[in-house]
């Protein structure tokens, strides 16, 4: 009997699709770019973003790659903002980046950042979703933590994170999840987030 209880515990602890109170935790497959900026001239910066957003290039980029783009302000960071670019999967990202990189409008927008951001403090990295619960795109505020997991220990950390969040579902009204850094960030290998519709 003891052997069967232990086997059931192992299966429960390592199940990737834990469901608790109708909250499923699994990867949503998304690939995202985090583009960190320190804005020095907010008006000029927003005008550059708006100009690009109204361009034929941006329209083609969105329609052909289904990209989702949003601007976020930061607190407790060396950067003032980040532009989050989200694709459904790696294939959509490849298509989207090819379109974005081929347009003069995107080049002009990026060039304008020399005048309205501190480019010495700009950086970006790419991540993929490992696990997500609830729909994060409806949330407007997030607590986000970047950290480094020792190589080979992602599964242990992921299971611990899911176990902790499952035990705290009554305290979490919004989304939560974990992303794996693919490249661009030597300081962090992962990030976890907890979102909500308001503070």
What function would you assign to each model-found segment?
Residues 4-14:
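Sec-dependent N-terminal signal peptides
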Residues 19-199:
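Short S/T/G/P-rich N-terminal loop/turn motif that feeds into the first structured element of a domain
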């Amino acid at each position: 009997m003891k052997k069967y209880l232990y086997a059931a515990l192992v299966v429960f602890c390592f199940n990737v699709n834990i469901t608790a109170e109708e909250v499923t935790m699994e990867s949503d497959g998304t690939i995202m770019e985090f583009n960190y900026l320190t804005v020095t001239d907010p008006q000029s910066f927003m005008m550059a973003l708006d100009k690009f957003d109204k361009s034929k290039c941006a329209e083609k980029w969105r329609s052909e790659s289904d990209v989702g783009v949003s601007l976020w302000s930061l607190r407790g960071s060396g950067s003032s903002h980040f532009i989050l670019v989200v694709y459904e999967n790696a294939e959509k990202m490849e298509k989207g980046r090819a379109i974005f990189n081929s347009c003069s409008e995107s080049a002009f927008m990026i060039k304008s950042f020399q005048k309205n951001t501190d480019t010495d403090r700009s950086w970006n990295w790419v991540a993929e979703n490992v696990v997500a619960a609830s729909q994060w795109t409806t949330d407007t505020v997030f607590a986000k933590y970047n950290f480094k997991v020792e190589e080979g220990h992602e599964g242990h950390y992921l299971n611990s994170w899911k176990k902790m969040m499952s035990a705290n579902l009554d305290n979490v009204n919004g989304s939560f999840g974990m992303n794996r850094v693919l490249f661009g960030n030597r300081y962090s290998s992962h990030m976890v987030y907890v979102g909500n519709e308001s503070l």
